[in-house]
UniProtKB/Swiss-Prot annotation:
GO cellular component, one term: extracellular space
PANTHER family registered for this protein in UniProt: BPTI_KUNITZ INHIBITOR DOMAIN-CONTAINING PROTEIN, KUNITZ-TYPE PROTEASE INHIBITOR-RELATED
Name of the protein described by the UniProt record: BPTI/Kunitz domain-containing protein 2
CDD domains: Kunitz-type
Highest classification ranks of the organism: Eukaryota, Metazoa, Spiralia, Lophotrochozoa, Mollusca
Location of the BPTI/Kunitz inhibitor domain: 30-79, 84-136
UniProt source species: Margaritifera margaritifera (Freshwater pearl mussel)
Tissue: Prismatic layer of shell (at protein level).
Positions of disulphide bridges: C30-C79, C40-C62, C54-C75, C84-C136, C94-C119, C111-C132
SUPFAM superfamilies: BPTI-like
InterPro entries (alphabetical): Kunitz_BPTI, Kunitz_BPTI_sf, Prtase_inh_Kunz-CS, TFPI/VKTCI-like
Endpoints of the signal sequence: 1-23
Pfam family, one: Kunitz_BPTI
Key word Disulfide bond present: yes
Keywords: Disulfide bond, Protease inhibitor, Repeat, Secreted, Serine protease inhibitor, Signal
Length: 141
């Protein structure tokens, strides 16, 4: 996300606030310290990016770091990038039986079929095996 600042005066304070605001938005939250609960006492289930993957933790409701996401999918989208870098074969919590394809990087570097539940999965979920191969396998070599 890119912020824009509208300066209506040449005040040094406004300019400083603008620069600080833009810098905070451009810094990737995935690099912040993971899983910081904070000093408050709520038990909010959130996700944090740690050791190359998104994991759940309980957030206290205040302070902490920006490495905190409301959902697993949001964490993966922000921290892992495109669909080929996301966890393969996430079924989700629903019970539909939808045939899909997912990219598995290691150890096979290939697209395989899986059954998607119909909700909450992630973007490593393709309706067409050819799209999966073209996007994930052939581009990576």
């Amino acid at each position: 996300m890119l912020a824009s600042c509208h300066i209506t005066s040449l005040s040094g304070i406004l300019l400083l606030l603008c620069v600080q605001c833009s810098a905070q938005i451009l810094i990737n939250p995935c690099g912040d310290v993971p899983g910081v609960r904070g000093p408050c006492s709520a038990n909010l289930r959130r996700f944090t990016f740690a050791y190359g993957r998104c994991v759940p933790f309980y957030y206290g409701g205040c302070l902490g770091t920006r490495n905190r996401f409301d959902s697993f999918v949001e964490c993966e989208r922000r921290c892992l990038g495109g669909p080929c870098n996301q966890t393969p074969g996430v079924v989700g919590r629903c019970y539909a039986a939808i045939p899909r394809y997912t990219y598995v990087p290691f150890p096979i570097n290939s697209c395989v079929s899986f059954t998607y539940g119909g909700c909450e999965g992630n973007d490593n979920n393709f309706e067409d095996v050819n799209v999966c191969f073209n996007l994930c396998v052939f581009r990576r070599g």
